[in-house]
Every structure is written in structure tokens, then in C-alpha cells.
Amino acid sequence: CTKGFDIKLEPGKTILDKDIILKPSDIYTMSKVILEETCVKRVGCMSGPNLAREIANQHPAATVIASKFEEVIREGESAIRSKRLQVYSNHDIYAVELAGVLKNSMALAAGALGGLGYGQNAMAFLITRGLGEIIRLATAMGADRQAFLGLAGIGDLVATCTSPMSRNYTVGARLAKGETLQQIIETSSEVAEGIKTVSISKKLADSTGIKLPIIQYIYKALFEGLNVEEALRYLMEYRWGYDADYM
């Protein structure tokens, strides 16, 4: 399953250090780690709008199994497909992994909107422009944009951004209500992957010149103490330009 991505750093360094410069080749997804650090030659991943509680309660759902190897996809499908879980395939494992990771940043922002009490217009705005940032960043990292228009991309993004059950949504909501990131981390029993995702994405954007205004201001709210309402004000004043400019 897609749980996140990471980078290799020198001892004593952190992603928040200002002198860290990231290139797309510095980013490690789970499959890349497995292929480089073990003897495994065939890997796959599962990603999609798969909120665990709903699946456990037998609500209808669908997922994507991605692998370069057809036999890995077939094996995964035979293991999990049921009358309540539909399975789709994709051969671009890297894009599917990135889709599953990058959506967590937008879930933080969605939670912040929810915490401020805003409605569906604001959420639709965020999801649509957030998808654009995800696609811009992922294509700069070498992924194909097609996967982001399916279940693993827009499907997972919608589910995660609209569900209070999402860990990342919860962090964003608490941040909007005045808690600091440190307070949230100290009182949370689960890890919100979006926190690290935001820091890596922002650093990569700084290094490559990719415009990611939503991620930039989520970062400022998380790590630099910017008030969430103030972050939203900056985004509402941002000159977005052409609609669907990521296609």
C-alpha cells in the first residue's frame, strides 16, 4: 500500500533545514525502497478511495492495484476483490504511489477549511486546484498524469478531503481551531503522513521552481506559525490564471 515517500539525508540534517536542495531523483517511494534495498524484483501497490472504516463496514468501494507486472496485479485482485470491493489495474506504479501520497497535503488543507466552517464551494475550489498542484509536482517527478484522473488520483483526493475520518483532515481541522502542530502531534495516536509530505513537496518546489501555492501556505501554517485564516486570505488573493492549466 502507499504509505508515503521519503528522502535520503546526511546525518544530522532534516527536511526543514534551509540549505537542503531536493531533486526529483532524491524522492523515494515505497516500491523504490523495496527494489533498491531488497532482492525483490516484482512489486505492486494498492491505492484509491479506501477509508478503512468504511471498508471494514462492508460499504461499496473500489481500489487500484498497480504494478509493471500483470501477474502481480492478478494476484492482488484475486486476494482482495469481493462483492463489496471492485478492483482496477494500472501499470504506472510510480504515478499511483505518488497520487496516494500527494493527496495527503490537500487533506490537511481540506480539514482546515472544515475547521473554519466553510462549505462545499470552498471545498470544490480546493480539490480542483489541489489536483492541479499534485499533477504539476508529480509530472515534474517523472510520473504520467493519466493515473491522477482515475480512482487513485481524483477518487482518493475527493474521499480524503471530504471525510472527517481522515487523519490528515483531522490535523488540518485542529490547526484551524488554534492548536499548534506540536500540540497536535503530542496528542495524536496516529501518524498523519501529510505533514512530512508537505515539507518534502515544498522543498522540492523551492528547488525546481514549480508553483504550488496551496502547499506553500499549508507549509507556512504548519511550520511557520501562519494563521490559517491568513493563509486562506493569501490564497484568495493569488493570481491563479487559466483554469485546468495542468492538463
Region locations from a protein language model:
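Rossmann-like NAD(P)(H) cofactor-binding subdomain of soluble oxidoreductases
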Residues: 1-57
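Short beta-strands and strand-loop turn motifs
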Residues: 1-2, 46, 90, 184, ...
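Short glycine-/small-residue-rich Rossmann-like dinucleotide-binding loops
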Residues: 3, 67-68, 163
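Short, small-residue-enriched loops and turns at beta-alpha junctions
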Residues: 5-7, 96-97, 190-191
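Internal alpha-helical scaffold of NAD(P)-dependent oxidoreductase catalytic cores
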Residues: 33-43, 60-147
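NAD(P)-dependent Rossmann-like dehydrogenase/reductase catalytic/cofactor-binding core
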Residues: 103, 110-114, 139-149, 153-247
